[in-house]
Amino acid sequence: MTTSLQDGQSAASRAAARDSPLAAQVCGAAQGRGDAHDLAPAPWLHARALLPLPDGTRGCAADRRKKKDLDVPEMPSIPNPFPELCCSPFTSVLSADLFPKANSRKKQVIKVYSEDETSRALDVPSDITARDVCQLLILKNHYIDDHSWTLFEHLPHIGVERTIEDHELVIEVLSNWGIEEENKLYFRKNYAKYEFFKNPMYFFPEHMVSFATETNGEISPTQILQMFLSSSTYPEIHGFLHAKEQGKKSWKKIYFFLRRSGLYFSTKGTSKEPRHLQFFSEFGNSDIYVSLAGKKKHGAPTNYGFCFKPNKAGGPRDLKMLCAEEEQSRTCWVTAIRLLKYGMQLYQNYMHPYQGRSGCSSQSISPMRSISENSLVAMDFSGQKSRVIENPTEALSVAVEEGLAWRKKGCLRLGTHGSPTASSQSSATNMAIHRSQPWFHHKISRDEAQRLIIQQGLVDGVFLVRDSQSNPKTFVLSMSHGQKIKHFQIIPVEDDGEMFHTLDDGHTRFTDLIQLVEFYQLNKGVLPCKLKHYCARIAL
């Protein structure tokens, strides 16, 4: 009798295993642990009753008997096709292991604008940094990443903006905006963002820097930069600034001192004695902004304004407005305040641009060049047989020659339509070629050109080419040098019926603007420096 019961029990177990693979796995695991007697069903139970039923189904038989006694018509019950899965006590455990966990990182939609006011909406996590937002836009738009792409916070109601540092959390920046404020995030290049690490001599003039302790000999700008990053010693920035009085429209010229603890001004001339110094602003709970139209918006004496704004929503009353005499002075003040506020974090952003807090790490970011692009080699097809060019200098010269040949073919193609003269052919070719270049900005004014260059950083060699407003058939090269913007007229010269472009009264001539720009990117010539970075308006 006992043997027959055990045989029936094992048969029922095998039937249950066939009906429910999950139950078979659980039972098999239990038998491996020696717990088979705890899970073994009684011999008089059906195979489908191996696993206990939920509490709601235990009294079904009693309810049916009560309904039968009361002559209540019974509704036909719908059988559960998988009672083992829904009734198993192990269901919650198995589900937790088999199904992926939900992502706990909250996401938020942000809108980012470009210089032409086109925008793009991004669904980003709450801990995304400014650098990661830039990286997303670079990848989505297939831009070249030269580490100069920057996210800007633009506050139009008070006419200021600032660079959002690469490590800052974008959602925290947005949380400080007022509900009715029409603030924007702008995405554009800023070549001057970390330029002070490369060329500190342009950012710290000798007459504006002093030291708390006496120093032996002269201190180089590189040593001054190292002092800003250290925690023991620090330089002191000082000079005259125009300050707007609180609650008034008037400005007052005062002597200021910038120290690690904050910004102070002297109540007695240029004296820096403690009894003559009065506190003006600190850095911890404030951000430094640059004024966009100080004269027009705030009645400033110059356009080189900057201000301190608390980390909260507010209007012009919360601003502490300052104004410098020249661009170099403003750049020195703003750079020193950034260094004192963020310290080594700025240097880490400069050295390790991809180390963000969110998911966009250096491993998840695709490189600038793909594997297939890196495997490309330079080839020369000028002879009867093609050959691989191994010398980089030769490869560059061949590429230049091919570019010139392509432009000559373009001239011939344009010359086949009708019978224009050589001069008209050259002008038509120029119109067809240079308008497609990102550095050409067509009919923009002198002020607009200066605004674009200032926005993208007053670094030596930042340039653009535009149409001349004074001479309709000529062009102008606008460039930055020494934190100043200079404009050079590109003069057309005709020789033997052919038109050329020149910057030096015809000593160096170019058939088109592309040749001119490429030449001055490699040679200084009559310019104060080589052309390095072009200003480009991008669309998102």
Swiss-Prot record:
Location of this chain's protein in the cell: Cytoplasm; Endosome membrane
Residues modified to Phosphoserine: S372, S375
Residue ranges constituting the PH domain according to the UniProt record: 234-342
Expression sites (tissue/organ): Expressed at high levels in the liver, kidney, pancreas, testis, ovary, heart and skeletal muscle.
Effect listed in the UniProt record for changing H507Y: In a patient with amyotrophic lateral sclerosis
InterPro entries assigned: BPS-dom (IPR015042), GRB/APBB1IP (IPR039664), Grb14_SH2 (IPR035034), PH-like_dom_sf (IPR011993), PH_APBB1IP (IPR039665), PH_domain (IPR001849), RA_dom (IPR000159), SH2 (IPR000980)
Domain SH2: 439-535
GO molecular-function terms, A-Z: molecular adaptor activity; protein-macromolecule adaptor activity; receptor tyrosine kinase binding
Top-level taxonomic group: Eukaryota
Alphabetical UniProt keywords: Acetylation, Cytoplasm, Endosome, Membrane, Phosphoprotein, SH2 domain
Post-translational modification: Phosphorylated on serine residues. Phosphorylated on tyrosine residues by TEK/TIE2.
Primary localisation category: cytoplasm
Known role: Adapter protein which modulates coupling of cell surface receptor kinases with specific signaling pathways. Binds to, and suppresses signals from, the activated insulin receptor (INSR). Potent inhibitor of insulin-stimulated MAPK3 phosphorylation. Plays a critical role regulating PDPK1 membrane translocation in response to insulin stimulation and serves as an adapter protein to recruit PDPK1 to activated insulin receptor, thus promoting PKB/AKT1 phosphorylation and transduction of the insulin signal.
Membership in a protein family: Belongs to the GRB7/10/14 family.
Domain notes from UniProt: The PH domain binds relatively non-specifically and with low affinity to several phosphoinositides, the best binder being PI(3,4,5)P3.
Assembly behavior: Interacts with the cytoplasmic domain of the autophosphorylated insulin receptor (INSR), through the SH2 domain. Interacts with GRB14 (via BPS domain); this interaction protects the tyrosines in the activation loop on INSR from dephosphorylation. Binds to the ankyrin repeat region of TNKS2 via its N-terminus. Interacts with activated NRAS. Interacts (via SH2 domain) with TEK/TIE2 (tyrosine phosphorylated).
Protein name according to UniProt: Growth factor receptor-bound protein 14
